[in-house]
């Protein structure tokens, strides 16, 4: 049967109503029309009655007119998948946007897939080493797990996700997928050029590239921002099922997925829920997050940045994502104001791997001791603010001194932030991190000044910096 053809009856911003004479397209079907020479894809969202469907546009609708013909593709949005997508940048509907010609593959896959069945899923408790001290020690990531980076505006989510790409994706033997969801175009451009510089993308020989990029940035209509995370996820699923290896899936930013869903929901006339979000918030998030999973064929390790509106972790959008994650790294404005980067909150960040049977007794005990000292320092801060340090007992003074050293030792220079800090990035092996913090907690370095612990890698650098500081002071 020939594909059904309809006519546009109404255009309301990113929402388009299309009337079909006989055969109505199904919900989630992709419709196509020609907008001034450009292919415009619409996705069916509602059946309105009288043979009319309401669809969401995946690109700008300026130029559409009533009466214009629209064709039903008879299936959901499908994108090119497989090795031909490596080294390429695609948009939400799988069109290349890197000016390197079409994606050379006939293999396509619908962006709407069922989550793997319960029997197909697999879990692992293997630690994914990142080389970042505060993460490896206090909230370790699981291979094949879901990781969330939570933070307000400007506390360093994107820098941290870039550093994780730098540390993990470069040494990672499998494939990576990066989905830029509703973030700055400049950051997407910077990331692309950084990947070329570090040979993760090889422009002259794309088959040697290890990453596929999918962008739906801030300037795109809400339909594109709502669906681009699914486009990236579809690529990652295909790599997992085809290669059977561990696929890395980076999303920046998952909040924009929710935000776009809220815009679309309002355009479709649904009654808003708490704080103006869509009533289907938990369903939308669950449908996507359940697909990001490890199966017996291979695994997906996902790192998702989550913007926290007004630094409020109880906002429905970040609160809904918490339930789906294996590890949460919370970035704190108070810590970033101290100049400590990465501004990870060591007391708020969590991981399901925080268990002596997974990490081993030594790692677990050191992590808990570090958190214990920091927690004691936090509870003493009110007393210090009112009465000053002199009113503390000798034991508490020692706790505060160690806590301040630990706090500074949890900072670390990043490769991707070299342009801001002027110092080379450092990666610290997990064994060295555990050993160093064990010694600091035990008081072996009580004689060193706290300034020596700031923005360094391992403990040897602390000693060298302390000597340098002593020499400069002499």
Curated annotation (Swiss-Prot):
The gene is atpD. HAMAP family: ATP_synth_beta_bact. InterPro entries: AAA+_ATPase (IPR003593), ATP-synt_VA_C (IPR055190), ATP_synth_F1_bsu (IPR005722), ATPase_a/bsu_AS (IPR020003), ATPase_alpha/beta_chains (IPR050053), ATPase_F1/V1/A1_a/bsu_N (IPR004100), ATPase_F1/V1/A1_a/bsu_N_sf (IPR036121), ATPase_F1/V1/A1_a/bsu_nucl-bd (IPR000194). PROSITE patterns: ATPASE_ALPHA_BETA. GO terms for cellular component: plasma membrane; proton-transporting ATP synthase complex. It comes from Roseobacter denitrificans (strain ATCC 33942 / OCh 114) (Erythrobacter sp. (strain OCh 114)). GO terms for molecular function: ATP binding; ATP hydrolysis activity; proton-transporting ATP synthase activity, rotational mechanism. Its EC number is 7.1.2.2. It is found in: Cell inner membrane. This is ATP synthase subunit beta. It is a peripheral membrane protein. Keywords: ATP synthesis, ATP-binding, Cell inner membrane, Cell membrane, CF(1), Hydrogen ion transport, Ion transport, Membrane, Nucleotide-binding, Translocase, Transport.
């Amino acid at each position: 049967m020939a594909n059904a053809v309809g006519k546009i009856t109404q255009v309301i911003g990113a929402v388009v109503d299309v009337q079909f004479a006989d055969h109505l397209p199904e919900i989630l079907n992709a419709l196509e029309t020609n907008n001034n020479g450009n292919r415009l894809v619409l996705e069916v969202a509602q059946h309105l009655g009288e043979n009319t469907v309401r669809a969401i546009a995946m690109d700008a609708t300026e130029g559409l007119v009533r009466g214009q013909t629209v064709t039903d593709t008879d299936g959901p949005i499908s994108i090119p998948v497989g090795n031909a997508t490596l080294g390429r940048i695609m948009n939400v509907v799988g069109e290349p946007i890197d000016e390197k010609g079409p994606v050379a593959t006939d293999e396509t896959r619908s962006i709407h897939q069922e989550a793997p069945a319960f029997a197909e899923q697999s879990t692992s408790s293997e630690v994914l080493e990142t080389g970042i001290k505060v993460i490896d020690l206090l909230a370790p990531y699981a291979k094949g797990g879901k990781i969330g980076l939570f933070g307000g505006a400007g506390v360093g989510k994107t820098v941290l996700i870039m550093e994780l790409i730098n540390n993990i994706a470069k040494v990672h033997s499998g494939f990576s997928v990066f989905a830029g969801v509703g973030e700055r175009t400049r950051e997407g451009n910077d990331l692309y050029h950084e990947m070329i510089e570090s040979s993760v993308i090889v422009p002259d020989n794309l088959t040697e590239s290890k990453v596929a990029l999918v962008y739906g940035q801030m300037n795109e209509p809400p339909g594109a921002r709502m669906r681009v995370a699914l486009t990236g996820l579809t690529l990652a699923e295909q790599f997992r099922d085809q290669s059977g290896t561990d696929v890395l899936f980076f999303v920046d930013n998952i909040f924009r997925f929710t935000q776009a869903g809220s815009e679309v929901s309002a355009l479709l006339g649904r009654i808003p829920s708490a704080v103006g979000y869509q009533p289907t918030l938990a369903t939308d998030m669950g449908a996507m997050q359940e697909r990001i999973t490890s199966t017996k064929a291979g695994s997906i390790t996902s790192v998702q940045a989550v913007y926290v509106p007004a630094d409020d972790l109880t906002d429905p959008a970040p609160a809904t994502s918490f339930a789906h994650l294996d590890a949460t790294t919370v970035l704190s404005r108070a810590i970033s104001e101290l100049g400590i980067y990465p501004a990870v909150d060591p007391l708020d960040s969590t991981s399901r791997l925080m268990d002596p049977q997974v990490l081993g007794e030594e790692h677990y005990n050191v992590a808990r001791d570090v958190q214990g000292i920091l927690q004691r320092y936090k509870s003493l801060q009110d007393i210090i603010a009112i009465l000053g340090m002199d009113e503390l007992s000798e034991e508490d003074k020692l706790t505060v001194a160690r806590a301040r050293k630990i706090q500074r030792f949890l900072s670390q220079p990043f490769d991707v932030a070299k342009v801001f800090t002027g110092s080379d990035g450092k990666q610290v092996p997990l064994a060295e991190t555990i050993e160093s913090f064990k010694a600091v907690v035990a008081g072996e370095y009580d004689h060193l000044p706290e300034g020596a612990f700031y923005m360094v890698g391992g403990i040897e650098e602390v000693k060298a910096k302390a000597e340098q500081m002593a020499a400069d002071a002499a």
